[in-house]
Amino acid sequence: MKRHRISIPYVTDQVLRNTSDVVDPNDTVDQLISDDVVNPKQDLKEFLDSRELNYRTRASLASSYDDDDWADSIVDLSQRPHNKMEESSLHDDKAIKQATQLNTDYNQLRSPNANSIGGQSVIKDVSSERKPPVNQIPEDQQIYPSQMYPLLEVPESYHSLIPKLQFFFKYYGLYEDSDYVVDKDNQGYYFYPTKKWTTRDQKELMDNISKGVDHDDNLLDLEEKTSDNLFEENLNVHQLVDFVTKGFYVEKRNIKGKYYFDINNPSLNINKIANVDCQDKILSAKEKIDMIFKASGIYRAMKLKAKW
């Protein structure tokens, strides 16, 4: 029987020193993305396809793109404020009890008569003053949609969707910080930006909408102002900008929600959407939604396997 010899190549010092041909895949992807951004001749579709391909390459190992089981691995971010509040309240209760006991013992030692309470200080039990839950609107406080600037409104029966939406908003940076509130009747959830987008000057907003009309400093109720043709279609406004400011319903399987886009939020890239040449085209609602989500950078993540 003839014996076959197998040659095994060994790594030499020369091979280890010769690293000029080694290419880092991460650098390649970054270079492709930078080329897509700085190249003005590139078509919008090619740019979006390349971004989607890069996203799929980077996220293929971390996500299954399954709309049913993907939400199970998402942490419910709404529980964090409650847990922190409960922990802080427990620590506050312990601290208050300890301070009360120490002050009582100290005052009893200083008092000439043990039965006299003249030298004892009255300590207010702060623990009895409970703050309302973070995600609950107080009943005595009137909240208008114009104050919350809701991005998404979903009914109470679809509460399982809330963690996934929070994950999308935070991960893709739609807002600096996203949270939701529950109305006082527990009939719906309202997503709204909690930090800098809620500090918008309401008086300036009212002056821009209806000039020459006196208003008080109360918040503007957008639902009541719809009868005054607040969102009346303007031929001078780009159709996509006009479309996103009105709001639109989206049905994702059995989940229905109404999306509102604030044109004053630069994170949604309204200018980029408006620069898309579609003035001479009649776009359907689905095509508009596709263009909006593609330009805002969340089309692939929000779509998954669902049908818009």
Curated annotation (Swiss-Prot):
**GO annotations of cellular component type:** host cell cytoplasm; virion component
Q: Mind listing the UniProt keywords for this protein, alphabetically?
A: Chaperone, Host cytoplasm, Phosphoprotein, Viral RNA replication, Viral transcription, Virion
Compartments where located: Virion; Host cytoplasm
Presence of keyword Phosphoprotein: yes
The PTM entry states: Phosphorylated by host kinases. Phosphorylation play an important role in facilitating trimerization and possibly P-L complex formation.
The biological process GO terms on file are: viral transcription
Reported function = Essential component of the RNA polymerase transcription and replication complex. Binds the viral ribonucleocapsid and positions the L polymerase on the template. May act as a chaperone for newly synthesized free N protein, so-called N(0). Plays a role in virion assembly.
Tell me the subunit arrangement. Answer: Homotrimer. This trimer is stabilized by binding to the L protein. Binds N(0), and N in ribonucleocapsid.
In Swiss-Prot or TrEMBL terms, this protein is called: Phosphoprotein
